[in-house]
Amino acid sequence: MGNANIDESDLKILEILKKNARTPYTLIAKELKVSEAAIRKRIEKLIRQGIIKRFTIEYELENEIRAIVMVQSTPQIPTPEISKKIAKIPGVEVVYETTGDYDILVIVRGTNITSINRTIDEIRSIQGVVGTNSTIILRTWF
């Protein structure tokens, strides 16, 4: 999945789609001053290369709570193995493997503190997890 074939136009397309994954190809083409067919081919190439993994939405419900959970793992169990188990837990939105004091960063979503705690407890119960540090997200800015 090398990025050797990525040029400025591809980066601009990615930037536009990151802001709004539903942007019509015609609008992207107009902004880049190319044909819609050229945009379609470039996006298909980005998907084929694994650069665009999926088209999704980010949402925030009024009564929903989100938290960042930083996870420390033991070296005896590979971090990807732990990360995959965490990703399967209900309430887990996204899992990142990281460097530093914590090996994994998890974004958790729930309807209340009890559901957030339940998800964190489930993360802690995974073999190889030796510690967590959690922070509630107050506001999100895009």
Curated annotation (Swiss-Prot):
Residues 6-69 form the HTH asnC-type domain. Keywords: Activator, Cytoplasm, DNA-binding, Transcription, Transcription regulation. Induction: Constitutively expressed. Residues 25-44 bind DNA. Pfam families: AsnC_trans_reg (PF01037), HTH_24 (PF13412). Its main location: cytoplasm. It is found in: Cytoplasm. SUPFAM superfamilies: Dimeric alpha+beta barrel, Winged helix' DNA-binding domain. PROSITE patterns: HTH_ASNC_2 (PS50956). GO terms for cellular component: cytoplasm. One of its GO terms (molecular function) is sequence-specific DNA binding. It comes from the Archaea. The keyword Transcription applies. GO terms for biological process: lysine biosynthetic process via aminoadipic acid. Pathway: Amino-acid biosynthesis; L-lysine biosynthesis via AAA pathway [regulation]. InterPro entries: ArsR-like_HTH, AsnC-type_HTH_dom, Dimeric_a/b-barrel, HTH-Lysine_Regulator, HTH-Siroheme_Decarb, Tscrpt_reg_AsnC-like, Tscrpt_reg_AsnC/Lrp_C, WH-like_DNA-bd_sf. NCBIfam families: trans_reg_LysM (NF040947). In the absence or at low concentrations of lysine, activates the biosynthesis of this amino acid via the alpha-aminoadipate (AAA) pathway. Homotetramer. PANTHER family: HTH-TYPE TRANSCRIPTIONAL REGULATOR LYSM, TRANSCRIPTIONAL REGULATOR, ASNC FAMILY. This is HTH-type transcriptional regulator LysM. It comes from Saccharolobus solfataricus (strain ATCC 35092 / DSM 1617 / JCM 11322 / P2) (Sulfolobus solfataricus).
